[in-house]
């Protein structure tokens, strides 16, 4: 099964439920209850995260997975993309298979709350995962491409 990016899902949203979708990324947030859990997954390609829905009935290793997964963990998920027009997000992924690629420590520094720039300066290796820096790097990349194209088109 070919892996897709969060960006491609949001840029060209499906018109109907789509099975066989595989995505990988980092867990931004996780909310869980006894029978189901919600994970916001970001792969760094888009500013909005993809919501994953884990249900105990459809995921045999539900208990173990929810125990191992925390904010910052790296996961790969497969499932069915379900349209949710009445919810905040246009769709969500109902997970049928989940693999933990890398666990995160309990003291992982990036949490759901907003962090100050001073704090982000102390964790330089994780700054690209913060929304502020992802946006800044995208703007910088587009500006550099525009300057490069301008100079190239004029023979420089």
Residues covered by each model-derived region:
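Class II aminoacyl-tRNA synthetase catalytic cores and aaRS-like
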Residues: 1-156
